[in-house]
Amino acid sequence: MIPYSAPIQDMRFVLNEVVGMDRITSLPGYADATPDMVDAILDEAGKLASNVLAPINFSGDQEGAVLENGVVRTPKGFREAYRQYQEGGWNSVPFDPEHGGQGLPWTLAMAVQEMWQAANMSFALCPMLNQGAVEALTEHGSDALKEIYLGKLISGEWTGTMNLTEPQAGSDLAAIRTRAVREDGHYRISGQKIYITYGEHDFTENIIHMVLARLNDAPPGIKGISLFVVPKFLVNPDGSLGERNDLRCVSLEHKLGIHASPTAVMAFGDNDGAIGYLVGEENRGIEYMFTMMNNARMGVGLQGVAISERAYQQARDYARTRVQSRDMTDAKGEPVSIVRHPDVRRMLMTMRAQTEAARALTYYAVAALDVAKKHADPAEAAKGQAMADLLTPVVKAWCTDLGVENASTGIQIHGGMGFIEETGAAQHLRDARITPIYEGTNGIQANDLVFRKVIRDGGAAAGNLFAEMRETVEALKHLPGDDMAAISIALGKAVDALEKATAWLVEHGKRMPQAAAAGAANYLRMFGITTGGFLMARAAMAALQGQADPDADQRFLDAKLITARFFADQFLPQAASLLTPITEGHRTVMALSEDQF
């Protein structure tokens, strides 16, 4: 077994000192989320993650999910783990109490979900996708649909899926061919969907598919797509399960990673057509789908944080115990643990700093979503929504890029043993590699950030964030110590570069869309580095203040300061280096003709 210990102390620090959990719990409806309750939830979630989910992660990867006679069997221990997860009420943490949820902040729920994802990413994909289905039904479903489906989806008695992709319609959902035909009181759905996470499994007795399909008289393109609830088993008026719907799992994909997560090819309507129920209004499916998609994108970004943490813990433990070569300062001494060697330290510090920055960014973005959902002042709620919208593509793309990078670095620290499957380090990289691809590729996230989140509002939402960054730069100048001064200078230079890049995009992006798109990935990376550095700076300020308390954990706070300084020294300077590729790189990106490739 490869152990996982939930980093609860760091999670609490980020929630309380960087995000400001008291600000979130003071919002209407969140009064029950007292500090004692938050601590208890984190502790209990950590136990489930470490003791139940983590022990079956490696074996689940080796065994994988299998399809036998139309039935998907998840690996040994997964079904029992889901039973413990569901009976513990973990699925209901952030959802509306009116339908059986606990009504706790999304910020807390994301911290809890980080533990699931780090302990066992394949397992955690099931509740993550279910969460998106719940959100879509909550926001857009009729009262009748909510009455039938929401309670059991929230409790985890049933699970939900997202059925978007088709063989010819990947990122371009306008190419969807799945059809919906009106029938008395419902619709008949026919078509094939691919890459459906947990499209079939043995966790629950019913699976509720959220399916994008097109009516025969619908307008062309994305404006003619509708969203439907298509249950595996139809539901009788009394809530009991009726007959099997006309849908089936055709096959499971054989994948690079997340082997224990069944990725299904689903066929709808082989016979008379699967019965489906319209969500909201006809031809507004793409709009509703983005409720699911944005939730999933935040969740996938969290996977990047989680896999970084898991890979870091394993690499750290290996470096402490692997003895190889003498210490550079003691040529005649005995061989030492490789954690003593500077390059191994550099790699471990890189993994640690990037993971902490990504965690802070994700929690900060989700906290903005809580403000959007709950703030009593509509203007403040709108600001929260704008901030969450701005940061969602950054969370999804930057954090998953870091997840892949950190998992690869973890293998490097293991040396040759990292390339051997039984070590377990390779699994983290194989699992992580899908995260920059699904729920919208990171290239799509970069375009979303540039064109929809920055250019569309003239940089207004970004400007609000930059103002917060500037306040932190100034505050650091008035704090004692070389570390605070160095972080202030590094952050200030990064913000300068980010503001210049943003101004260039706002000025030229509409007139030169190809140029803006050519620099979009670099802009998103700059945005992630700078925002991560801003939040690491806030962490450093809080750690410095905390050191005044003689009862505080001084070693933990000292590590926070050192890690923040490392991020400022090693990563914030990269932001300025990306300015020229953003503003000038298009000249060569698009220079070759197609036949020159």
Placement of each model-derived feature along the sequence:
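Acidic, low-complexity proline/glycine-rich segments
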Residues: 1-25, 274-283, 314, 320-321, ...
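Alpha-helix capping/hinge segments and adjacent helical runs
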Residues: 2-5, 182, 258, 364, ...
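Glycine-rich cofactor-pocket loops
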Residues: 29-32, 62-74, 284-299, 313-352, ...
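Internal maturation/activation junctions in enzymes
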Residues: 65, 78, 129-130, 141-178, ...
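A short core secondary-structure module
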Residues: 186, 190-244
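A glycine-rich, basic-preceded beta-loop-alpha segment at the flavin cofactor/substrate interface
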Residues: 195-197, 234-250, 255, 262-296, ...
